[in-house]
Amino acid sequence: MSTDTERVEEGTETSFLESWRDWYHLPVLGVVMLFMFWVRAQSYGRFVTDDGTPAFAGIDSWYHWRTINWTAENYPHTMPYEVWTGFPTGRYVGQFGTLYDQLIVTAAMIVGLGDPSQQTLYTVSLLAVPVMAALVAVPVFYAGRRLGGTLGGLVSALVIALTTGQFLSRSTVGQLDHNAVEPLFMAIAVVAMMVAVTAGEREKPIYELVADRDWSALRTPAIYSVLAGVALTLYIWVWPSGVLLVGIFGVFFAVQLTLDYVRGISPDHIAFVGAVSLGATAVLTTLLIEQPGSTGSTSLGLLQPLLALLVAAGCLFMAWLARQWNNRGLARLYYPAAIGGLIATALLVMWLALPGLFDSTVGNAIRRMVPIGGTATDLTIVEAQPPESFFNSVFREFGSAFYTMLAGLGFLLLRPLFGRKFRAEHTLVIVWTLFLISMAATQVRFMYYLVLAVAIVNAAFAAELVRLFDLDLESGLTSIRSLETYQVIAVVLV
């Protein structure tokens, strides 16, 4: 009897340990999120006035507050028009009256049981930004987990929780600007695209399957690709200038399809993901158009669906060109040069035939993403100015985590040299990170975007440290006892 009891207890203990190993990250992630919210809600009392008069930090917060009030009275409609800007005629302002304001009002509607009071609306608005900042830990964790396992994901969540700088200062109570919700939805869009391209690599969709309408073989990559397109659309809906992520994805697909073809892999797999995801984005952003004749990046107009459609078409064209290249027996090494020449030609034609669209795409890309050629208007806006010293700025923002991120990028790039698989999502993270670094060097406000890459890529760095020191974390203390002194010193220094 005692033996049977011991076996049952041993089995129960083993089952508990296995469950804890599989799910321990959830309570840890929950604690991290609570900590992020708690830190940002410390100054709540400063914004609770005796007479109930709203008090916000920053100027743009008041624009959102007026939009939120109007939306609450006319729910679910929003007002992308600012009557006090250019008074008395007012003007369209695409960055206000977005999904962000609608989400806050929806939360207030739930709390206020369909009829929120002014006080309820104000309280929800005060707490919305800290909540959204805390939620950033979720997509950051899952992105980090894809690069460095569960431990890497938790490292990513801890990095973003402990990071000070602009991401913290722009997401505290009293701030009502869209600066906190932008990183949240960008992180969701990037994670969704990571999942989609991995599904494309795994399921290997090709043109023949589409021609034969073999939906059973195409279902999984198609679903994940559409979801990635939806996530990208939500990001643009929150911030119309988020169309820059469409451009980043476009560069990624151009690089990845070229790499695949040169390595002897069919570009159809990733081209399918690009065409479906960006095609879905083109359709959905068309439904969001508020200024049909506008190609500006700050309004929901033609730019977003047109650029998404161009990227989708570009993916299809590159896959078609690869097949033609094979049919003619041309050397694969010349394919990248052909793609580069065609892109340059397309930009030249756009500059000559569609100068307005060229300026909206290339001009805005240079203005926001390349640390040269800033406009005089940008230089008069504090947050749009380039940092005086980039490396001093990133050290103030992220400490040594920025440099461990660079090491993580190096580890990702060197994976093939060590016989380890280099996946498409690795290319995506590398391209995206390089763009975020360039953006942060262009406008100081984009430091609150760079924090995403710093946190996520540190997961790869942490995973490589574990691999380097051969730490088997699941086997207990055995491997830790085998550590040499120099290895412990190295970890402490890092």
PLM feature segments, named:
Residues T427-I430, F435-T478:
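Hydrophobic/aromatic-rich transmembrane helices and adjacent perimembrane loops
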Residues F253-A254, L316-W325, G341-L352, G399-R420:
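Hydrophobic, aromatic-rich transmembrane alpha-helices
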Residues M1-D50, I59, L135, V140, ...:
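Start-transfer (signal-anchor) and selected internal transmembrane alpha helices
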Residues L218, G264-H269, G329-I339, L357-T361, ...:
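Membrane-interface helix-loop-helix junctions at transmembrane boundaries of multi-pass membrane enzymes
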Residues I206-W215, R219, L245-L333, E464, ...:
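Perimembrane helix-loop-helix junctions
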Residues A41-A187, T198, K204-E208, P240:
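Active-site lumenal/periplasmic loops and adjacent helix-entry segments of GT-C-fold
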Residues L34-M36, A128-R146, T150-S216, T220-T258, ...:
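Membrane-embedded helix bundles of polyisoprenyl
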Residues G112-S117, L288-L300, V362-F398:
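Juxtamembrane membrane-water interface segments that cap and precede transmembrane helices
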